[in-house]
Amino acid sequence: MNKTTLSLPPHSNGVTLSLNELVHYKNHSLQWLPPSQSVWSKMNGSHQSRQKGRGMDFSEVRQYQPGDDIRSIDWRVTARTGKPHTKLYNEEREQPTMLFIDVSDTMRFGSQLLFKSVQAAHFASLLSWITLAAKDRVGGIIFDGLSTLDCKPSSRQKSVLQFMQSIIEQHNTNSDSEPLDTAQQTSSFAKGLSQLQRLCPKGSEIVIISDFYALTDECKAIFSQLSKHNRLQFVMISDPLEQGSTRFNGTEYVSDNKRSAWLDFSSSSTKKALEQQANLHKAYVQNMAMQLSIQLHCLSSGLPLLSQLTSSQDPSQQDKGAK
């Protein structure tokens, strides 16, 4: 891949979202299909490839697409509509992808390139197109800090586009809203995970995309239940400034929704304190993930998504150069 390919989508401004911006990742989906390579292997995880034959349980009928098995053509629907339609089947090895996308207050922050919430949407979009290319279903829940929006899993491109439009609307509509109370947000986060549990088909691959600042011990029991019948992945998104990595040397008034203060970024002790706080938070998330045998992956909002997936270096380490 050349440098241009690894840059941001041409329609991205880093703060708000557009449909063209998310559809951009469709062009990159095929290269990440297992078994040749996978997003998870590039993020120091493992993603088992699935070899799928013709399914056994009928799922739905949709218009024929290139690559569909001609033996599955539904001739009755084809004759009635005048357009070829094919039957889709659920297979024993089918693995729907269910995404939990956090676009809450703490995610709407970025010091260099993107808001964390925008990076979350980019990654969710890439996973959605990869899942669609693998002829699996994708859906999920969009969490804005107070409420959730459900999108049932589907293997139709139209449904995936509607899913992305929902992410955009949920993200952009709440961009200027007042910050929520921390206790309220953590409670809503747990409720959103419970909703995911009700929506999720058994045997799904569940991907939680968040900065996990709303994570509490209450969530552990929910994750434990989800992991009994599904495969979970944590994708933790952070910003370089949260880790003390910044070229800014002035004084800035900042808030984390719990407290506000003036910070002197020319001071090495300020940057060190931020780094220590970030490390403590990451350790908390890592510990919960380890206890539940959930894989934890990291992404930075300070770098384009595709450049991180093609690098062997941890995103948090790539950001260190910004100090």
What are these regions (language model features)?
Residues 2-47, 63-68, 77, 86-99, ...:
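Exposed, interaction-prone extracellular/peripheral surfaces
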Residues 125-128:
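Structured adenosyl-cofactor binding patch, chiefly the S-adenosyl-L-methionine
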Residues 52-55:
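A positional/architectural concept
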